[in-house]
Swiss-Prot record:
Family: Belongs to the RuBisCO activase family.
Protein name (Swiss-Prot/TrEMBL): Ribulose bisphosphate carboxylase/oxygenase activase B, chloroplastic
Tagged with keyword Nucleotide-binding: yes
GO molecular function, one term: ribulose-1,5-bisphosphate carboxylase/oxygenase activator activity
PANTHER family (alphabetical): PTHR32429, RIBULOSE BISPHOSPHATE CARBOXYLASE_OXYGENASE ACTIVASE, CHLOROPLASTIC
Organism this protein belongs to: Hordeum vulgare (Barley)
Function, in words: Activation of RuBisCO (ribulose-1,5-bisphosphate carboxylase/oxygenase; EC 4.1.1.39) involves the ATP-dependent carboxylation of the epsilon-amino group of lysine leading to a carbamate structure.
Chain segment of the transit peptide: 1-43
Superkingdom of this protein's organism: Eukaryota
Residues bound to ATP: G153, G154, K155, G156, Q157, G158, K159, S160
Gene Ontology cellular component terms for the protein in this record: chloroplast stroma; thylakoid
Alphabetic keyword roster: ATP-binding, Chloroplast, Nucleotide-binding, Plastid, Transit peptide
Length: 425
């Protein structure tokens, strides 16, 4: 009886270990082998020598830029597969720069280059536009930066084109608007301005600089004399631009309100006469005004860009500009286009007047190509005087008054009658 009891309770060695389970088994074998670990913390008798430790460090060179990238390229010339190597002496494989010189080249200070693809940008124009755009993307302490830059001046002086050149040089793709879009259904032009402004703000939100560019604002929102109808849309356009200039980060679309602020978007507008605009819009706090009147150097620089592909010498361009000092810059572009008239006239004579439509609009050969005509200073002077005579005719002959008073052509053909020749002959 006792033996039976002891075999059940005492669990002798003959009992299978599977019966005890895994956890019990581990505890059973390790229960009498517990050890205590004693951790001793001893203070260092002397301070560590940092210099000795650094000298012994195999990675100490990481803290100092002592390598020469160009020489590294040279050393690896015979080791790296030639498939992955550019020819020596080409590009960055010219072994002349050290690593520090590479950094200084990458962080070098760029000069104020005022050309874009060979086209001239007036330094004063470029300075005004770049500073205005940069200020509007900065946080200046206790400074109220005008949101709108108004560029105005005479007709044909290249205001819009100079703006496009500066935008291209800065890598900006602006949201474009025209004054022709500022007249439609009631309230639509003001809504359109807000939509375009929000589109530019979305582009800025995506990490790319942008601005709103409105061409010829005075033609759409201005008042040109007593005969011009001043509509509600004109009022709303002026009021909208004033509101945006006052709160550039809170521009809402009609019918909705978004509490989230939008980025500040600088606005560039061009025009010929800003005195026709609503006076509170053009006050200094809202609009910074810039009168663009190109100097002789600016006109020469732009004209060199106009004739840059025609091999016209610089002294001929200077003479051309000095011969027509009162003309706009656009005059010289029209003058260059006039030189191609002879080539077109010759082509029409070869193909025949009745075949022009078939040849130009729906032809397998495509439009004709011309060899670049030779532009001499004599030919340019001749066409320039022709353009001036046509301008004088428009100013001298007031055909509208003639039509009202008599059925006559006025003095439009007097010059041709006296000389016996018409223009373009």
């Amino acid at each position: 009886m006792a033996s039976a009891f002891s075999s059940t309770v005492g669990a002798p060695a003959s009992t299978p270990t599977i019966f005890l389970g895994k956890k019990v088994k581990n505890y059973y074998h390790g229960g009498n082998k517990m050890k205590s670990r004693v951790v001793r913390v001893m203070a260092a008798k002397k301070e560590l020598d940092q210099g000795k430790q650094t000298d012994a460090d195999r990675w100490k060179g990481l803290a100092y830029d002592i390598s020469d990238d160009q020489q590294d390229i040279t050393r690896g010339k015979g080791i790296v597969d030639s498939l992955f190597q550019a020819p020596m002496g080409d590009g960055t494989h010219e072994a002349i720069l050290s690593s520090y010189e590479y950094i200084s080249q990458g962080l070098r200070k760029y000069d104020f280059d005022n050309t874009m693809d060979g086209l001239y940008i007036a330094p004063a124009f470029m300075d005004k536009l770049i500073v205005h755009l940069a200020k509007n993307f900065m946080t200046l302490p206790n400074i109220k930066v005008p949101l709108i830059l108004g560029i105005w001046g005479g007709k044909g002086q290249g205001k819009s084109f100079q703006c496009e050149l500066v935008f291209a040089k800065m890598g900006i793709n602006p949201i474009m608007m025209s004054a022709g879009e500022l007249e439609s259904g009631n309230g639509e032009p003001a809504k359109l301005i807000r939509q375009r402004y929000r589109e530019a703000a979305d582009i800025i939100n995506k990490g790319k600089m942008c601005c709103l560019f409105i061409n010829d604002l005075d033609a759409g929102a201005g008042r040109m004399g007593g005969t011009t109808q001043y509509t509600v849309n004109n009022q709303m356009v002026n009021a909208t631009l004033m509101n945006i200039a006052d709160a550039p980060t809170n521009v809402q679309l009609p019918g909705m309100y978004n509490k989230e602020e939008n980025p500040r978007v600088p606005i560039i507008v061009t025009g010929n006469d800003f005195s026709t605009l609503y006076a509170p819009l053009i006050r200094d706090g809202r609009m910074e005004k810039f009168y663009w009147a190109p100097t002789r150097e600016d006109r020469i620089g732009v004209c060199k860009g106009i004739f840059r592909t025609d091999n016209v010498p610089d002294e001929a361009v200077v003479r051309l500009v000095d011969t027509f000092p009162g003309q706009s810059i656009d005059f010289f572009g029209a003058l260059r286009a006039r030189v191609y008239d002879d080539e077109v006239r010759k082509w029409v004579g070869e193909i025949g007047v009745e075949n022009i439509s078939k040849r130009l609009v729906n032809s397998r050969e495509g439009p004709p190509t011309f060899d670049q005509p030779k532009m001499t200073i004599e030919k340019l002077m001749e066409y320039g005087h022709m353009l001036v005579q046509e301008q004088e005719n428009v100013k001298r002959v007031q055909l509208a008054d003639k039509y009202l008073s008599e059925a006559a052509l006025g003095q439009a053909n007097d010059d041709a009658m006296k000389t016996g020749a018409f223009y373009g002959k």
